[in-house]
C-alpha cells in the first residue's frame, strides 16, 4: 500500500488469481483514492495467462497514455529523497555494487539531496563508522540508540541478518556483510 502512495508511482495494474487475501480490486481502489490511474484483473477471470497478459498490456498502455498528459514539475536536488534497500549480499557487494551506491549518495548529498540508509541491522559491529558522521550530538545519540536496539534484537533472536545465501555468495561473517552494507551509505553526514 505504501508503494501505491509513493509520489513516484503514477499508476498501478494489480493482478491476482482470485484466491489472495489482498485483492487486486482493493489495491486499485486505494490508487484511485490517491488520484492515481489504476486497473485490476484476475488471471482466471480473463481466461488464462496469455489472455490476462494481453489485457494487462492494454491496461498499462491506457494508464501510460493518461500519465503522459500529466504536467511535469521542476524540482531541485534539495527536493529529492532516495533510500537504499538490500539487494542481496555476496563477496562483491562491498567491492563494487554498494560502493557505487555510496558514491551516488555522496554526490546526492553534496547537491542538497537526502540519502536514507535503513539497514541498521546490517551495520552490526560498525556503529562507530556511523556515529562519527552524525551532524550533531542528537543525531549521534539517535544512531547509537537505534543501533543498540537492533543489536539487542539480534541477540534476543540469535540472528544477525546473515543468511545461508550470503555464505553461499562468499561472505563469512556478519562483520564482513556489515562492511559491504555500510559502504552503501556513502561517507557524508
Give the role of each language-model region.
Residues 1-189:
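Metallocofactor- and cofactor-centric catalytic cores in central/energy metabolism, strongly enriched
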Amino acid at each position: 500500500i505504501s508503494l501505491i502512495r509513493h509520489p513516484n508511482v503514477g499508476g498501478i495494474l494489480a493482478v491476482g488469481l482470485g484466491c489472495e487475501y489482498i485483492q487486486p480490486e482493493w489495491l486499485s481502489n486505494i490508487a484511485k483514492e490517491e488520484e492515481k490511474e489504476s486497473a485490476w484483473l484476475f488471471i482466471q477471470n480473463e481466461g488464462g495467462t496469455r489472455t490476462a497478459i494481453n489485457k494487462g498490456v492494454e491496461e498499462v498502455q491506457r494508464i501510460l497514455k493518461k500519465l503522459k498528459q500529466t504536467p511535469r514539475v521542476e524540482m531541485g536536488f534539495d527536493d529529492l529523497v532516495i533510500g537504499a534497500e538490500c539487494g542481496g549480499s555476496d563477496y562483491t557487494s562491498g567491492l563494487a555494487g554498494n560502493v557505487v551506491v555510496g558514491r551516488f549518495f555522496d554526490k546526492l548529498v553534496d547537491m542538497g539531496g537526502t540519502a536514507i540508509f535503513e539497514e541498521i541491522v546490517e551495520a552490526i559491529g560498525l556503529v562507530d563508522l556511523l556515529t562519527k558522521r552524525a551532524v550533531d550530538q542528537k543525531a549521534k545519540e539517535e544512531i547509537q540508540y537505534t543501533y543498540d536496539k537492533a543489536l539487542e534484537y539480534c541477540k534476543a533472536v540469535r540472528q544477525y541478518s546473515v543468511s545461508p545465501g550470503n555464505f553461499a555468495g562468499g561472505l563469512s561473517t556478519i562483520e564482513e556483510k556489515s562492511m559491504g552494507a555500510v559502504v552503501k551509505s556513502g561517507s557524508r553526514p
